[in-house]
């Protein structure tokens, strides 16, 4: 089934037809750099689409697990991160949309009793990985004998999570 989460009628029809006990929302426009040039896509998919899912859960399902992002930690310099750390300084529109999801889920939980769990995934890698992510870019550069392009002078530190670990943790 292919469905656009910004299409509320189609989404609500799916909820009505399927009678979900739990919803796991992994739909989002991902990527920090892309959000700079395509902000509308992020607001429509990550905010409006998520709102539609919350509205459908409000009326048709009371449990929602959803993907947030490590990018909500923004300018937080403490390492390692903790789920109680402040997340009020996003550094990209993508991060702001994911923080918005967390706030919206909290409100729907408080107002309507929906059980919500947001999972702050760190960079996910593995088979079928996104072609714009560093593991794929680095592997392609190495196999093609090209130099690896680094950002921030190569001083960046990044946590990666293997897709199978994400699946186990989410389920």
Predicted regions and their residues:
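N-terminal Rossmann-like NAD(P)+-binding domain of SDR-like oxidoreductases, especially those catalyzing
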Residues: 1-124, 164
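NAD(P)-dependent short-chain dehydrogenase/reductase
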Residues: 78-80, 103-171
